[in-house]
Amino acid sequence: GNETLGNNVDAHLDLNADNIADTPRPQGSPGRVFDFTFSSASEPTTYRDASVTQLFYYNNWIHDRMYSLGFTESAGNFQTNNFGRGGNGNDAVQADGQDGSGTNNANFSTPSDGSLGRMQMYIWPGGTPDRDSSLDGDIVVHEYGHGISNRLVGGGVGISAWQSRGMGEGWSDFYAMSLLSE
């Protein structure tokens, strides 16, 4: 389609924090060009389509990069259609931009393969203007990193103790620092 919904990610707003995509999603031009106004001097409410589009891009970029490194269908990656290559489908990342359920944070909930992973990206108030975590590649890749490590260790349920959760934070920081510094 011509919206921020694809095989790897469903990127959308979730302003009311109900975990249901706020629609309509950003729409591209007939040539699938998603070109929206953005100014870092403006409040996040003024560039929502740009924010969701960037979140869609980052999620697809990290999906493809990690796929090339072995996080494929049979390893439990996040895809709606696995094209007969193993693993369970119907689990594209649900990427909630400007999620209304929190502030000053982001998170990634990772159930087992075949169930939807959920990335929640929040607004960081207090500055002038407020900041949108969907536009920060380090945060998006870090959160996606939780999805990767949670799927690879214990099939979505293996990183729950304090020590393993601490390791998960370190791995996610490593993904962001190493992949975005290339």
Range-by-range predicted roles:
Residues 1-182:
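Extracellular zinc-dependent metalloprotease catalytic-domain scaffold
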